[in-house]
């Protein structure tokens, strides 16, 4: 039986895990470390570096080093590296490729399939980009699961008692809150909320600003305007942040950071926590939205699990305990728990006996644009939800629509993501035409079917009821991820 590995493709760090027996998953080391920096670079001789070596060269060669690429997933951009330019999917594929290679060495066999985790609040484009990165790395991505869900699998696998668990997942670049119900090995996600641009990187930025401002006032030099100085500051701040998780004070000391100027600053944990408190309040708003969607009060929660390296900041646990009245749990390393859960899901899909079954949800509503009434007036911008957020996956829903005028033969189907009453206020996902409808009077019946699979990938079918004429499109593959584009990206790599 071939192993299906579990991968946590993170903003700051990435991990890979597998389950070879019915015991606990094992985290596979990469160059001797269980945590690999999600960093890609090119050295001065043009050689590709991934992981720790790439991060180590960041200060000396910042122009040729890329960090936090996860925050750009789903964007149609390219980033220069060496004498080429790469998409976020291509950069991520280098990270996945390094993890794959390490696993093959460790296991002594080919690794061809993987379960990859994403933030619960990743949209369709970001999920599709993650899948494409896996393909470019030579992996068959058999499942994409949400990070909080993976954490629940790892933490609660095999426990029989019924529990309601809040997963608080604060990573390097993203935040998710998910409410999970578990009973008799069934892991069912009830609701999710989050922010795909809130995490430890934002804490680093606040800390960098706090340190750089006094230096600028004293010397008239903006450390953040000098690329090498800015990267030295970033590395020093990241180290200080980790220190403040365990100690009340941290010192940032960088000699000759610019010319003959030195940086020497002491920061207290109290100062740092006051800086990040407004961002953590935003996470608590998401937590309460998550509870509201599931129609639970805080007292209904049995356990809180902390996930992600940024939860090591003591203020996180204090805020949660003060607000929810429950002391959070972090018995399993918060950096590793997601990869371990993905490995459990991978083992289940490979046919191995596992003690948990996953029932995941979509955190988003998907729908279409139609003509209708809004605030007492007719408009062609009414949003009609088809799949509601927090629906269990996989899910398929069908709604009935009508042609607008006699002999209408073409219809533009537009798909949006969101919950606002007007389509234009939601996120546009994609569109397509269905042409050649029969010449009929206005009111010709059109069936619109939306299907969302377990990976959160959306398939849309529009069909004329009278004739059966239909067109089906998998959203996000019309413009990207096609075989031709993948081959172009493979050749670029």
Where are these regions (language model features)?
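Oxyanion-binding/catalytic loops of NTP- or PPi-dependent enzymes
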Residues: 1-75, 79-85, 94, 101-493
